[in-house]
Curated annotation (Swiss-Prot):
One Pfam family matching this protein: FlgH
Family under the similarity heading: Belongs to the FlgH family.
Subcellular location(s) of the protein: Cell outer membrane; Bacterial flagellum basal body
GO cellular component, one term: bacterial-type flagellum basal body, distal rod, L ring
UniProtKB keywords: Bacterial flagellum, Cell outer membrane, Lipoprotein, Membrane, Palmitate, Signal
Disulfide-bonded cysteines: none
Subunit structure as annotated in this protein's UniProt entry: The basal body constitutes a major portion of the flagellar organelle and consists of four rings (L,P,S, and M) mounted on a central rod.
Molecular function terms, GO-annotated: cytoskeletal motor activity
Gene name of the encoded protein: flgH
The name this protein goes by in its record: Flagellar L-ring protein
Origin organism lineage: Bacteria, Pseudomonadati, Campylobacterota, Epsilonproteobacteria, Campylobacterales
Membrane topology: Lipid-anchor
Amino acid sequence: MKKVLFYVLPFAFFGCSATVDPQISMKPPAYVEELAPKQSNNVESAPGSLFGKGDNPLFSDKKAMNVNDLVTVVIQESTTQSTQANKATSRTNTSNLGGGALTGSSGVVANALNKVNAYSNIGFQTNSSNNYTGTGSQSRNESFNTTISTRVIKILSNGNYFIEGSRELLINGEKQIIQLSGVIRPYDIGQDNTIDSKYIADAKILYKTEGEVDRSTRKPWGSKVIEAIWPF
């Protein structure tokens, strides 16, 4: 029994390590942490002024301008993929090896030996061929559309915003989780304080579900282990 476990356990561990689901880290990019935050210019308003500086100046747009301000992100992501591969190989090999039973000498003796060799020639011939043909194709279309409110976490020294937001929904026992982070330019924010996801640099978008539907569509771990270690 111990010998069986000794041979089986390594394959089981390998299978478990090879069946880990893809993960995405929502940690900010390194440069976001390295860049110093933009220094705010706090200018005191003149006494009695009607147009003093504040969080919402009179003639400013109602857009995110400061840390902790909200920005609505319109997520419109679609991917289209189509691949096709063909491979064909062929190899033929023929080998001949032969030799006379008698060799050497010259003149009359050589002629006599050649006649003997013509009737007593020994040798062998091999023929081998190998053919392989493979064809594969794949097509995939996916789209994901939703909106999510994010918060300005940091204003970088160049004026760009690092935003982050999440949303969780629980509907009939099925939990939906949406997380988003990335870097945006304030100039790309629309007049209605929204921005399209295509303008987000280093965007990380996570969407996952937890519940009965997710468990029913997930492969059992035993099947994943067998598929990972099965060599054929």
